[in-house]
């Protein structure tokens, strides 16, 4: 019996690794989440091992050897930094704010301040570093032996680093691998790694560079043409709008799109997810499923938890209104539909409540973890199954479930 051809798509998060097997047309055969050991993920000398071990555990969970793997594509959060020396690692996670630098700097780079944190607070680690990678870049290195820095699009260079700025802060560019573009083929999976996945060591499986999770999520929701909107939530929540020019208004953040000449404008709600989780963890719902908790709150509107979700939903409504106001200046669209991704997209009760409060149509795609679909789109574009990321996204991203206001 012929095996189904799939891309093995990986996204490295802060507390877990997500993975899925996705076909050329966007069908998700299987998916899994591997939680990192809470003890190891807090140890900077073990974090990178957590990623590596979780990758192989995900492969085992998905039974990847039962499929014909045609590609692997990896994304992850940033700016996480992993120093590598003699096969030993030290990782400074993107959200580790336990340290500071003597003289804070003004820069557009999100990486240089983190590099300086590493340099000033861990001088011995810094001096012994052979090279420094992000999370996905480290896993790519482990699988292929290739050292790369993934630049999502040329306009992102200010958010990364330029040689002049590295010189100014006495950071050796030899520590930082050369830039490669999104989708770059880093190499093939080493035979010993294939064997750990119960795949023949002679098989040639290319590993493609997915890059930052924010970028792959925008690709995986097809937020790639002017007027498209997606709502990406986790500990924070970002409402994203694809535009043809930056929007210079208070509260809006502008970044390049992966589509040349386009931009992504986002309106950020910094702590919506965190606030709800903090309440949940301090209540009798601490160890119970999110969906059961939301269902209870919707039936018990006098509960403190309901007041929190009602407050959050109204903040989201206000953010949607701000984004839609800008969308209407860009397009003539009347039928507004917003694609939602992240943990929220897997919770039907929350999605319906959100639709009721915002009075908008909300969509969940065939892959609610949009980062994984973004990786599949990148892989299939590089495999020449599609002529561009945009063409692949148009075919592979499908609205699987629509939530319409009922109240």
Language-model features, listed with the residues they occupy:
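Short, well-ordered amphipathic alpha-helical segments that serve as non-catalytic structural scaffolds
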Residues: 48-62, 161-165, 315-322
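Short beta-strand-to-turn element immediately C-terminal to the catalytic PLP-Schiff-base lysine
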Residues: 22-23, 82-85, 118-119, 141-144, ...
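N-terminal phosphate-binding loop and adjacent alpha-helix
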Residues: 30-67, 102-107
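Gly/Ser/Thr-rich active-site cleft segment
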Residues: 12-14, 106-204, 208-212
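Short glycine-aspartate micro-motif
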Residues: 5-11, 68-75, 91-92, 132, ...
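Glycine/Thr-rich phosphate-binding loops that ligate phosphate moieties of nucleotide
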Residues: 1-34, 39, 70, 74-103, ...
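Alpha-helix C-terminal capping segments
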Residues: 220-226, 378-383
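A polyampholytic, Gly/Pro-enriched intrinsically disordered region
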Residues: 104-116, 196-201, 228-230, 381-396
């Amino acid at each position: 019996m012929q095996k189904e051809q799939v891309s093995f798509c990986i996204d490295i998060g802060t507390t877990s690794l997500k993975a899925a097997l996705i076909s050329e047309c966007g069908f998700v055969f299987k998916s899994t989440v591997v939680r990192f050991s809470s003890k190891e993920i807090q140890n900077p000398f073990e974090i990178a091992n957590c990623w590596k071990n979780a990758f192989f555990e995900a492969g085992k969970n998905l039974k990847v050897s039962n499929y014909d793997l045609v590609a692997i594509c990896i994304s992850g959060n940033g700016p996480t930094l992993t120093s590598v020396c003699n096969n030993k690692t030290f990782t400074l996670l993107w959200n580790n704010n336990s340290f500071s630098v003597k003289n804070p700097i003004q820069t557009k780079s999100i990486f240089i301040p983190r590099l300086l944190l590493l340099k000033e607070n861990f001088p011995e680690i810094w001096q012994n570093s052979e090279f420094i990678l992000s999370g996905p870049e480290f896993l790519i290195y482990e699988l292929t032996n290739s050292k790369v820095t993934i630049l999502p699009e040329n306009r992102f260079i200010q958010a990364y680093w330029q040689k002049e700025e590295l010189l100014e802060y006495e950071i050796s560019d030899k520590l930082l691998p050369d830039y490669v573009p999104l989708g770059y083929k880093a190499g093939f999976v080493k035979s010993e790694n294939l064997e750990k996945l119960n795949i023949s060591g002679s098989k040639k499986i290319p590993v493609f560079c997915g890059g930052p999770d924010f970028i792959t999520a925008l690709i995986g929701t097809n937020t790639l043409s002017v007027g498209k909107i997606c709502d990406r939530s986790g500990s924070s929540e970002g409402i994203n709008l694809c535009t043809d020019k930056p929007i210079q208004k208070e509260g809006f953040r502008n970044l390049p799109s992966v589509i040349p000449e386009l931009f992504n404008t986002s309106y950020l709600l910094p702590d919506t997810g965190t606030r709800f989780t903090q309440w949940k963890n301090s209540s009798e719902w601490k160890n119970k499923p999110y969906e059961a908790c939301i269902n209870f709150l919707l039936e018990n509107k006098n509960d403190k938890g309901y007041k929190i979700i009602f407050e959050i939903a109204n903040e989201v409504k206000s953010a949607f209104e701000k984004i839609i106001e800008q969308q209407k200046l860009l397009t003539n669209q009347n039928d507004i539909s917003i694609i939602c991704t992240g943990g929220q997209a897997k919770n039907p009760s929350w999605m319906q409540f959100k639709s009721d409060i915002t009075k908008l149509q909300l969509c969940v795609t065939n892959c609610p973890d949009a980062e994984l679909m973004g990786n599949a789109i990148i892989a299939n574009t590089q495999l020449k199954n599609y002529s561009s990321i945009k063409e692949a996204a148009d075919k592979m991203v499908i609205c699987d479930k629509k939530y319409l206001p009922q109240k």
